[in-house]
């Protein structure tokens, strides 16, 4: 081959390689169709779903003092979500939370989600992703039978115990203003503390969502018939964990359609 021909061939090959290389560098790499989102992958790699749950709310999330086992409606929902992600409903790690601690534990990544009688509000939706509601309840009042109190107006001049950072305080205050009842609120860290305060006379009423109150009802107390401000419970996840939020919502939606959600509500005597 002549020298000029050889040089021409080399030039053509070089141009072809350069063109191919440039073309490849401008194309975006396509993610595999079965790629797993980072937030879901983190759970899969860990092998366990971490959930913040209530441990002092009978029927929703309650830790048996004898066995140490946490059971309830929301625990069963957590298991269903774990099964969706990991294929095994037992792969859960539940951590007890209160109305005051559930947000910070989610913020710092100690839990993947919070499913703990967490009421959906517009303000909270600015900070967290919330699923569609899986349970709706109204705020109620638990009082001592011997008190003779039969309605909210009868609490005029009385003290009402509520949980820290809970929505029940605002709901009751708004209704109290409507009926002209001047009430004082005392805030507590846990529901058992509020019940103890009611039993000892430190407060005249215990206010929280009605389904929760039923777990603290005994022979000496009664739940007033009035209900205030419907509370919608949702599963909360960090704003950045959008894939997990979607998976949670899809799981709950499927459970509603199949009737499984209603079965669990009936199982725990919430309907």
For each of these PLM feature ranges, what is it?
Residues 16-21:
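C-terminal motif of bacterial Sec signal peptides marking the signal peptidase cleavage site
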Residues 24-45, 167-185, 218-227, 253-271:
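Ligand-binding clefts/hinges and TM-proximal coupling segments of bilobed small-molecule sensing domains
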Residues 31-37, 42-113:
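Extracytoplasmic small-molecule ligand-binding "clamshell" domains
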Residues 53, 70-85, 119, 137-190, ...:
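Bilobed "Venus flytrap"/periplasmic-binding protein-like clamshell domains
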Residues 55, 135-143, 210-253, 271:
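Periplasmic-binding protein-like
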Residues 75-76, 84, 159, 166, ...:
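Extended ligand-binding regions for polar small-molecule ligands
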Residues 79, 91-153, 221-222:
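Acidic, polar ligand-binding/catalytic clefts
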Residues 101, 118-126, 171-176, 196-230:
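A ligand-binding cleft/hinge motif common to bilobed small-molecule-binding domains
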